[in-house]
């Protein structure tokens, strides 16, 4: 096999591996089964209300609903990263009521990787991680996210 074919196959395999570990974007408004209970995202006058059952636990401005979800072993959502007009918002459904953490920086999220308690985001402004409410811009490194 030629070196070019070997290199091409390795590149394709790497791309497939990367895509399988990145979490896809969803626009589901609900019902969404989470560890905290059933969640709905209802449109209101300026954006959306995040409802756990019949109680609103957050409101955010957004033209459209977009979120990246992490599913637990039983298939229910454990965490979700919401795309809002003011930047990403992390909902941690492992707690009841859900923990809400705002990134505090306007950016458009393209891909999300869940790493323990941190969420790593590829955005239009570069790579960032959100951990315990702190947003950090990531520098080039050899760490692999999957």
Question: Can you annotate each of these PLM segments?
Answer:
Residues 3, 15-17, 70-73:
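A general, composition-driven signal for non-globular sequence regions
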Residues 9-19:
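Bacterial N-terminal signal peptides
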Residues 24-146:
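Exposed acidic/polar residues on beta-strands and adjacent loops within beta-sheet cores, strongest
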Residues 1-11:
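Bacterial N-terminal signal peptides that target proteins for export
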């Amino acid at each position: 096999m030629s070196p070019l074919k070997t290199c091409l196959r390795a590149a394709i395999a790497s791309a497939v591996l990367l895509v399988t570990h990145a979490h896809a974007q969803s626009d589901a408004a609900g019902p969404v089964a989470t560890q905290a209970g059933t969640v709905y995202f209802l449109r209101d006058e300026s954006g959306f209300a995040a409802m756990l059952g019949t109680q609103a636990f957050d409101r955010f401005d957004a033209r459209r609903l977009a979120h990246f979800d992490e599913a637990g072993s039983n298939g229910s959502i454990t965490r979700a990263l919401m795309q809002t007009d003011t930047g990403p918002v992390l909902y941690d459904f492992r707690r009841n009521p859900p923990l809400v953490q705002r990134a505090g920086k306007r950016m458009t999220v393209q891909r999300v990787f869940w790493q323990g308690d941190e969420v790593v985001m590829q955005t239009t402004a570069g790579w960032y991680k959100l951990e315990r409410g702190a947003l950090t811009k990531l520098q080039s490194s050899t760490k692999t996210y999957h």
